[in-house]
Amino acid sequence: LNSGTKLSFGQDFFFKFYQAFLLKDRWMQYISGVGTTLLVTALALALGVVLGSVVALVRVTHDQQRPGHKNAVLGFFNAVCQVYTTIIRGTPMMVQLLIMSMVIFANSRNFTMVGALTLGINSGAYVSEIIRGGLMAVDPGQMEAGRSLGLNYMTTMVVIIIPQAIRAVLPALGNEFIILLKDTSLITVIGGKELLYAAQGIMNRTYEAMFPL
């Protein structure tokens, strides 16, 4: 097109669409970004569920100890878990990403994995409270019934308590997945090449924001 050429609305619309998606196969950059976004979300959710489950079990087990039978080691780990959830839930995700990428993993160039790790650690703090709430929502009589049948504490938790808690926490875990999916856009600030990163790159080349975003 010549400089200053006047385009109709339809021509302008198609030209901007062509620039953003078809020119130089730019649509492939979006596909790559979507793949990275889903990968980061899956890794972060897996880490968050594992970490959150461990933290929740430690805290629930500590809280259910009988008076006079407190375990010092369990008390220490419970305190660590409380500090972890308080700090992670009380600081912005952006700050956590910057600390992980510029301080802890300052020499790493794998920004996608650093982003996934950070999101997973962040998610773990929230998932732990979701799972802890689900475990505490189970009728205490269920634990007493399991123990009266001769099952030890861990067996009762695995066989009786946790299966009931899972049903209660599934909707909240679904919400956490959606939140993680949206939060992946933040890893752009540390160089993670997800969907927003791809869109920004194309926007910087075409000087057009509507279609890339």
What is the predicted role of each segment?
Residues 1-213:
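Transmembrane alpha-helices and adjacent helix-loop boundaries
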